[in-house]
């Protein structure tokens, strides 16, 4: 079940558990994380960063919709997270795909900007 981060944190608080966040770089990662989450009946965060795309490993427009679709069909609570998005266009693209949470990486930007 696709959820936002507030829903995931609420479950973590109710069950007194930590939630794993896993950076996804291929389809096998998605399967491994979600199959294990279902087996353990644990909520999970699937994350994707810009780095795999910059390194030409995987593109957001290829893997993002698959991540969202698989989260929607699963029995466990899953948040889709854009991890370390370095520009607003890329973050907007992740939200358009269906991601439910983002983290803007501004460490390379000067304080003046």
Question: Where on the chain are the PLM-derived regions?
Answer:
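Active-site-adjacent beta->alpha loops and helix N-cap segments on the catalytic face
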Residues: 31, 56-64, 84-93, 106-113
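Aromatic/hydrophobic pocket-lining residues that form π-stacking "cages" and hydrophobic walls in ligand
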Residues: 8, 33, 67
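Hydrophobic faces of well-ordered beta-strands that scaffold small-molecule active sites
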Residues: 19-23, 44-48, 78-84, 102-104
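N-terminal low-complexity or amphipathic/hydrophobic leaders
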Residues: 26-48, 53-56
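Glycine-enriched alpha-helix->loop->beta-strand junction motifs that scaffold or abut catalytic
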Residues: 40-42, 96-102
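Alpha-helix-loop-beta-strand connector modules within alpha/beta enzyme cores
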Residues: 57-80
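N-terminal amphipathic alpha-helix/helix-capping segment at the start of soluble metabolic enzymes
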Residues: 1-20, 64
């Amino acid at each position: 079940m696709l959820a936002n981060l507030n829903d995931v944190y609420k479950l973590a608080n109710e069950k007194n558990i930590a939630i794993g966040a896993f950076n996804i770089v291929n389809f096998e990662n998605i399967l491994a994380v979600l199959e294990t989450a279902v087996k353990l009946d644990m909520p999970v965060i699937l994350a994707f960063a810009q780095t795999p795309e910059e390194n030409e490993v995987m593109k957001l427009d290829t893997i993002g919709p698959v991540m969202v679709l698989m989260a929607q069909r699963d029995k466990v609570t899953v948040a889709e997270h854009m991890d370390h998005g370095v520009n607003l266009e890329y973050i907007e693209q992740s939200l358009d795909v269906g991601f439910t949470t983002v983290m803007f990486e501004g460490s390379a930007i000067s304080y003046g900007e």
